[in-house]
Amino acid sequence: MSIRTDAPTRREQILREAARLFAERGFHGVGVDEIGAAVGISGPGLYRHFPGKDAMLAELLVGISERLLAGGRRRVEEADGDPRALLSALIDGHIDFAINDRALITLHDRELDRLRDADRKRVRQLQRQYVELWVEAVREVYPALEEADARAAVHAVFGLLNSTPHLGPAGALTGRTTTAALLHRLARGAFAAAADGN
């Protein structure tokens, strides 16, 4: 029997470094040899794990969309019908993503159009489901908010939270806890402001 440790698998290491390099230099600006060197294997050695760069990009972007949706659904279950707790948990979960996976945000912004049609459609489908989960949560807390306004507010909050790559290098953040608390307050304030207009 194999026991899982906290150490990332070789495949996870490859994906993490590919995301970092793609975010820094663009998908077409990075070769398999560079990704391989970043994880200590030859470029051709990557083909034992992935058929090519396209497969890495697809796994990164489809994978994060799947994880965000699964995390959102888990938070719905854990909130046990408390709409304020759910909205707070959704915000916190997305903040964790926005702080910890900044390269994936950059990658999504710049490289989504590089995915094969089927993968791009899958990402968009997962994202729509994630947005709708948030829209329902926002409308539970702010029932006077029209559905279209709630959806617009959710997209605006995603823009706010997903701005973390623009805060400078990872080490330039004022501290994870301070940044997370600020983002949480701003997100809650945005939803409250949207509801105040009704």
Model-predicted regions and their roles:
Residues 2, 10-13, 17-55, 59:
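Helix-turn-helix
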Residues 37-42, 48, 52-54, 78, ...:
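A cross-kingdom feature marking solvent-exposed beta-strand/loop segments within repeated
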Residues 59, 74-100, 153:
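Hydrophobic alpha-helical connector segments
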Residues 105-109, 120, 124, 139-187, ...:
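Hydrophobic/aromatic-rich alpha-helical bundle segments in the mid-to-C-terminal region
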Residues 57-64, 108:
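Alpha-helical DNA-contacting segments of helix-turn-helix folds
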Residues 61, 65, 87, 120-131:
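Amphipathic, non-transmembrane alpha-helical scaffold segments
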Residues 13, 19-22, 68-69, 91, ...:
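Short, structured motif recognition centered on aromatic/hydrophobic residues
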Residues 24-28, 79, 101:
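Short coil/turn segments at alpha/beta junctions that flank glycine-rich nucleotide-binding fingerprints
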